[in-house]
Amino acid sequence: AVDAFTSIKTDFFNAFEDLKQYQQSTKDWLFGYLSYDLKNDIEQLHSTNFDGLNFPELYFFQPKKLFLLKGDQLEIQYLNLCDDEVEADFEEILECQKSKVETDAMLKIQQRVSKENYLDKVSKIITHIRQGDIYEANFCMEFFAENATINPIEIFTKLNEISRPPFAVFFKNHKHFLLSATPERYLRKVGDLVVSEPIKGTAKRFLDPLEDEKSKTQLALDPKERSENIMITDLVRNDLSRTAQKGSVEVKELCGIYSFLQVHQMISTVTSKLDPQYSVVEVIKTTFPMGSMTGAPKISAMKIIEEQEETKRGLYSGAVGYFAPNGDVDFNVVIRSILYNQEKAYVSFSVGSAITSQSVPEMEYEECLLKAKAMREVLS
């Protein structure tokens, strides 16, 4: 999707109402994103942590041109079809030159929170859990580089060669870039069917097939990982029930194990049938931010996250996706992603893990480093 015919950009105030009006007035393809901090439009919450990226909280656009890959065929849709423009676009594509911008060879990636500080923060979250304030919290930390120059297309290509995820996204809005290799779907709607696929549970891949199978089996049977996943699956069930036809919410798969190039993941699938009195934007508002990136109970977890994290999440742990003209949607979860503000020469990526009463801070730290591995590789 390229070239904005119309667009909407806003902060968190009345964001979902503005999006609903925009979607219903255009009734066209819309592409864009929702930042994690739109939580402040849904609940009485705030975001005061450091923000080195300064992305808008919400941005969607109605494209002039749409390129749809269907199997081995390319379908091109133009908002206002003009034969001369189609020909000119094909010539431009064929003559397209590779960007001469090179990624800094000496890019210095820094960790926002030291290991010692991270372990202390996780211990504080565990104390909250043992006191009964929450059951689980998804705690994240940022890696960043200042005065940085990268080639976004080159980095995106490398990242997806390493990971080959199902919901990858390259998104450019002026000087803001998202290079995402996410394996997680947040929300899909087809007709009246709504689907959410939360990920909770991660295990390392190994080159040795026997060792790799052992890691996969251990993940499937790990009581802590299953507990994390089941808690979030229950939260998603509850969120979907708010806009669902009575009795239609189902867990289609619980704690399924899926293998990606870098890691094994535990994924559950929850579905519902949309009650006709609710719009698709209301489904998003009542399920956002996704439970896999907050914890449970959601509001209490988000408050504790804000206290302990040192970076504003922004688009990280938000969602990127589209609205189709018929009202269907598909959105991913922005994880395993690199964010780049070209104007500020600032590169950022964040990783996190679910903290429960069974968490060992050192192991949570190691899980974060495992998730950061692919992004560090492509940037270094």
Model-derived features with residue positions:
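Extended alpha-helical targeting/anchoring segments
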Residues: 1-380
